[in-house]
Amino acid sequence: MSAYLSNPRVWQESWDRQQEAFLHDREERFAAMLEAVAATTEGGAPKVLDLAGGTGTISLRVLARFPGARVTVLDQDPVLMAIAEASLRERGTVVDADLGDPGWRAKLPEDGFDAVLTATALHWLPAERVAALYGEIREVLRPGGIFANADHMPEESLPTLSEKLRDHGRAEREARYASGAATSWSDWWARAAADEFLAPRAAERERIYPGTRHHQEWTPPALWHVDALRVAGFSEAGVLWRGGTDAAVVGLR
């Protein structure tokens, strides 16, 4: 039997471990985002859009913090969406949509979200698309709703330190790979492609994403994102959390 079908939770947990090799403070950014959701939502049952949500990492943490929450995961990756569907089951909705297409909102089952949350995802989009996307995100939020984006956002006033932090993190990560303490990005995907259930989805993923797609990262400083959120019409925007070369920015509709 497929390792996926026998225990889909294994894949969810292995994704978390693989991501934590890149982001040692991954849970801290999630906690900061959820605290902001709690502060801006009445009733303790927020309606949350997990944007570019992959395996549903954020959604699972939303449900753990707010058991009555309604979550929607939006992504385009067939492998990650399959894991999200198995992990959430009847507790959430998974939507297949491309954020590079301005028509992504038409695929949502509803709008008026209390929160739209995303992490370590939008750096794959070009600057002009991110700026436009912020305006589109604002439109699916209820008045007073919150948007949070946690990603690679180096401090522009610390270029030397930022470079050293990146190099240090890379060296630590490679050491963990070499010792077997962590699974690398490429190894994780190779394992998924070898799984009986996920293999067809991995093949579909290769058709959707050209081989060079994930080589083009765009990581401006947090202030760029804050300015873009203000231009997009958010009433307030700023930095919620920072850890090394990463940050979480938020905007209030």
Predicted regions and their residues:
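Short catalytic micro-motifs in class I SAM-dependent methyltransferases
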Residues: 120-124
